[in-house]
Amino acid sequence: MAYADNEYRCFVGGLAWATDEQSIERCFNEFGEVFDSKIIIDRETGRSKGFRFVTFKDEDSMRTAIDRMNGQELDGRNITAQARGSGTRGGMVGGYGSGGYRGRRDQGGYNRGGGGGYGGGYGGDRREGGYGDGGYGGQGRSEGGSWRN
């Protein structure tokens, strides 16, 4: 598939491991021409991580797909569709993943997508425990959750 000069890419998450490229293209082509659909594979297991990026020819097609598909069921799972890079107030979604720093927790920017790894989170601030749910800090640590305490 050819790539668009401007990329109109959206993140599609919550996918079943069995969801293949044909299912995605069949579903998303309804809203406009799909240039590319990139599935993210776990290096250790060789299985889908349950999300992919879909690139459209134009912005209107991408926006329509996001509006219509976000929260809909595909292959037995409710999926998430959002513009690539649209995160909460703290910043963008990191890399090819649902994680990454998204600002302070108390401002709604904390990412609960897990800690570390490819696309994993490291959000929050040190007062809140920082480094994501699956990483350093949090409950049971020294008061304040800082690595310095």
From Swiss-Prot:
It comes from the Eukaryota. InterPro entries: Nucleotide-bd_a/b_plait_sf, RBD_domain_sf, RNA-bind/splicing_reg, RRM_dom. GO terms for biological process: miRNA transport; response to cold. Induction: Up-regulated by cold stress, dehydration and salt stress. Residues 87-101, 110-123, 131-143 have a biased composition (Gly residues). PROSITE patterns: RRM. Residues 8-83 form the RRM domain. Residues 80-149 are annotated as: Disordered. One of its GO terms (molecular function) is mRNA binding. Keywords: RNA-binding. Belongs to the GR-RBP family. Possibly has a role in RNA transcription or processing during stress. PANTHER family: GLYCINE-RICH RNA-BINDING PROTEIN RZ1A. This is Probable glycine-rich RNA-binding protein 1. The lineage of its organism: Eukaryota, Viridiplantae, Streptophyta, Embryophyta, Tracheophyta.
